[in-house]
Swiss-Prot record:
The species this protein was found in: Rhizorhabdus wittichii (strain DSM 6014 / CCUG 31198 / JCM 15750 / NBRC 105917 / EY 4224 / RW1) (Sphingomonas wittichii)
Protein name per the record: UPF0102 protein Swit_0572
GO MF annotation terms: nucleic acid binding
Family assignment from sequence similarity: Belongs to the UPF0102 family.
Pfam families linked: UPF0102
Domain of life: Bacteria
Length: 118
């Protein structure tokens, strides 16, 4: 298996783990791998009147996770979220951008409301 295929597989596994974690904490997954012209959102989750657009990063070690999220990636998620809000945001009061950090054999880390825009 080449590197790209392995990375894709690892990413999909991380997204499944993140979705599982969110469900255990009361979230309902309403979308996954949703693409727009502006970017892609890994998971869209809703709990009550809160809607979260979730970027999932999966790495094999802590050092890789530390550099996995940057302003450019968050800006793309925020742009995609803005485009998707009319479809998924009906009846919500709070909208936020979250990040899930996933490592093998470790508890996922859920960072909430990480993007505040410019």
């Amino acid at each position: 298996m080449n590197r790209r295929a392995a990375a894709e597989r690892q990413g999909r596994t991380g997204e499944r783990i993140a979705a599982w974690w969110l469900r255990l904490h009361g979230w309902r997954i309403v979308g996954s791998r949703v693409k727009t012209r502006r970017g892609e959102v890994d998971l869209i989750a809703r709990r009550g009147r809160t809607l979260a657009f979730v970027e999932v990063k999966t790495r094999g070690d802590a050092a890789g996770l530390a550099t996995a999220i940057d302003e450019y990636r968050l800006r793309r998620v925020a742009a995609a979220a803005e485009a998707l809000l009319p479809r998924y945001g009906v009846g919500v009061e709070n909208v936020r951008i979250d990040v899930m950090l996933v490592r093998p054999w470790r508890r996922p880390v859920h960072l909430t409301n990480v993007w505040h825009g410019q």
